[in-house]
Amino acid sequence: MSSHSDPIGDLAAAISRVLEGRTITELTRLSGGASRETWRFAVDGEPLIIQRQRSGDTRDMEVEASVLRAAAVAGVPVPRLVISGRFDEGARYIIQSWVEGETIARKILRDDVYASARRSLVGQFATALAAVHSIPIDDVAGLPATDQMAQYRQSLDDLNAQLDQAHPAFELAFRWLEGNRPASARRTVVHGDFRLGNVMVGPDGLRAVLDWELAHIGDPMEDLGWLCVRAWRFGSERPVAGLGTREALLAGYEAASGSPADPDALRWWEVLGTLKWGIMCMLQASAHLLGFSRSHELAAIGRRVCENEYDIMLALEGRWSTLGVA
């Protein structure tokens, strides 16, 4: 048996098998995260994209595929799902249509070609999120339903025990969040990571909502609050993705969804989103600090923890009376 290894050829052959023997050309790797790889290829001149699951990832890509199908039916702009399943060697995959456009936030926020898009994106985001939240929960069996605050409270406690660090700004945020949690009777499908970087944008505006692997059942205001987190403004002072105002986002969402959108709930989820991102930065940095995965990139992410502490203080400004702080 030959010891020759051809990963690209092997992947092309695997894709060809699931596409009934079609010829695969132009197979090019685009990215490779911790849990999945992304490749572009063509079949009969049509550009497609495949995401292949890495070993060790416990998330079910079939659930993600079912969300994509339901999202398309609900009117969410998403890439067309071609096929999903499991390769012979066991790795799960999703193949989708290629959507032309830009995902890099700084280009979307600054390049002249997107000037017209910038004027319409907040409204388009509101409409897209209203469609996401209209997906019938029964159509997407298998989505987790977790208490986000409890999950990240436990994560911070575990990190504090391992790293022996103090993060008083995070504790302040938890204290405020616990005392001001909004009452919400709505439970919907939530995208879980809706922001610049996870949407495809063209000169005409929003073209597709991408990256559904964190979808879950929760409060729909979570998606709107995450979109307002300061880290996702990429240097712009405009609070909604660096593009517009919270008032415009809420008005557009109410018009598209027919459901009231509480500005206080939006702020609550914005604070929680900022806290979550800070703890997520800690989690990534801890992999380096604890020796699990030595990486300059992971170590550098650790410096963003203090940025999020600062962002939390800004987000809580003017709310000290609810904390009992003079």
Language-model regions: role of each:
Residues 28-172, 182-186:
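ATP-binding pocket architecture of kinase catalytic cores
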Residues 189-191, 196:
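Catalytic-loop of the protein kinase fold
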Residues 210-215:
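Activation of the activation-loop gatekeeper triad in protein kinase-fold domains
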Residues 222-258, 272-291:
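Active-site activation/catalytic loop segments of kinase-like enzymes and analogous catalytic loops
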